Amino acid sequence: MFSLRTAQPAQSLFRAATNTYSTSLPRSAIAARSFATVQSDIFKPTKYGGKYTVTLIPGDGIGTEVAESVKTIFKADNVPIEWEQVDVSGLDAGNKHSEDLFKESIASLKRNKLGLKGILHTPVERSGHQSFNVALRQELDIYASIVLIKNIPGYKTRHDNVDLCIIRENTEGEYSGLEHQSVSGVVESLKIITRAKSERIAKFAFSFALANNRKKVTCIHKANIMKLADGLFRSTFHKVAESYPTLETNDMIVDNASMQAVARPQQFDVMVMPNLYGGILSNVGAALVGGPGIVPGCNMGRDVAVFEPGCRHVGLDIKGKDQANPTALILSGSMLLRHLGLDEHANRISKAVYDVIGEGVTRTRDMGGQASTHEFTRAVLDKMESAL
């Protein structure tokens, strides 16, 4: 795997980024900046006049509120980014305006190569409408989802010493969108697993593990029942593992993995899995360390990288109430900055967020506090100013 900015192997860049962890920041705040491809350096973010142009898709629900928090913090820190905002919504999916905005968001991401994204709502009751979130990942082939699950210092949860990474294949599996009603009352839904994409995500997971000084990679599957589909994923994983003899490997059935994650999450390091299992275990993992409001994530492809909260929660129930926790999107934005090599900005912003949470004075309701979104953002800004 190579850097997105140079032909230098990304491993050294990962390590350079994670070195900061030893000072004050959790490793989740020091996520590696350059892991879009395991093949070649073809990633060229757009930069004009000394600034990077980044696509911003606030998303539905609390998206606009937390996106404003990120924009305010980035502006205060003079981050060299210009936002190209596209207000696409999944709530209005199906009408021409919404479809046009979705196409505009795709074009923007193809042009800029980088995006910061909230979560787009997918109506459960609307038949025939594919999730915009899934369609975007498939259209751009951003095949690897990375969710970083780690305790925040000073914020006590049920488990201590949790530090794991969930890597999820983003473009096939049960999310292929191939389902139909053959006769009334009988639905067929197709799960697609290919050797090529299983191999690609396995190589990504092993490369990520090496680059971030991780020790073990676990394959999550249901090959005891889906012997062909998950059997192919599992066997491909073990074949790829032969090229990484320094890493410990094992595999685990998803039912057991869910139980083990709740009972003893410390046993996991890097976990790689098909699409559906990744969605489930990302949410389980978030619950271990404080909930969806604090877990950052990103989606990587060969040409485009999109950073978004690790748990794909829309938050329609608290929309407009100034109650949302912006931490997940802020930290996802910090990951984006490291991806660009803007480590100084990323470190300053991440440290301020973790210091505010660690002090316990200004926390949003999901973390047991009473602070509003604006109050939390103001506290982060104050921390950044006091550090100068």
UniProtKB/Swiss-Prot annotation:
UniProt site positions, description: Critical for catalysis: Y175, K222
Cell location: Mitochondrion
Cofactor(s) needed by this chain: Mg(2+); Mn(2+)
Enzyme Commission code(s) on record: 1.1.1.41
GO molecular function ontology, one term from the record: magnesium ion binding
Keywords for this protein: Magnesium, Manganese, Metal-binding, Mitochondrion, NAD, Oxidoreductase, Transit peptide, Tricarboxylic acid cycle
Residue stretches in coiled coil: none
Record note on cofactor: Binds 1 Mg(2+) or Mn(2+) ion per subunit.
Amino-acid positions noted as binding substrate in the UniProt annotation, renumbered to this chain: R137, R168, D255
Residues that, per the record, bind Mg(2+): D255
Gene3D superfamilies, per database record: Isopropylmalate Dehydrogenase (3.40.718.10)
Catalytic function, reaction form: D-threo-isocitrate + NAD(+) = 2-oxoglutarate + CO2 + NADH
One Pfam family recorded for the sequence: Iso_dh
A cellular component annotation (GO) from this entry: mitochondrion
Enzyme class of the recorded protein, top EC level: oxidoreductase
Origin superkingdom: Eukaryota
GO terms for biological process, alphabetical: isocitrate metabolic process; tricarboxylic acid cycle
Transit peptide: 1-35
InterPro entries xref list: IsoCit/isopropylmalate_DH_CS, Isocitrate_DH_NAD, IsoPropMal-DH-like_dom
PANTHER family per UniProt: DECARBOXYLATING DEHYDROGENASES-ISOCITRATE, ISOPROPYLMALATE, TARTRATE, ISOCITRATE DEHYDROGENASE [NAD] SUBUNIT BETA, MITOCHONDRIAL
Annotated family: Belongs to the isocitrate and isopropylmalate dehydrogenases family.
Subunit structure: Octamer of two non-identical subunits IDH1 and IDH2.
Cited function: Performs an essential role in the oxidative function of the citric acid cycle.
The protein, known as: Isocitrate dehydrogenase [NAD] subunit 1, mitochondrial
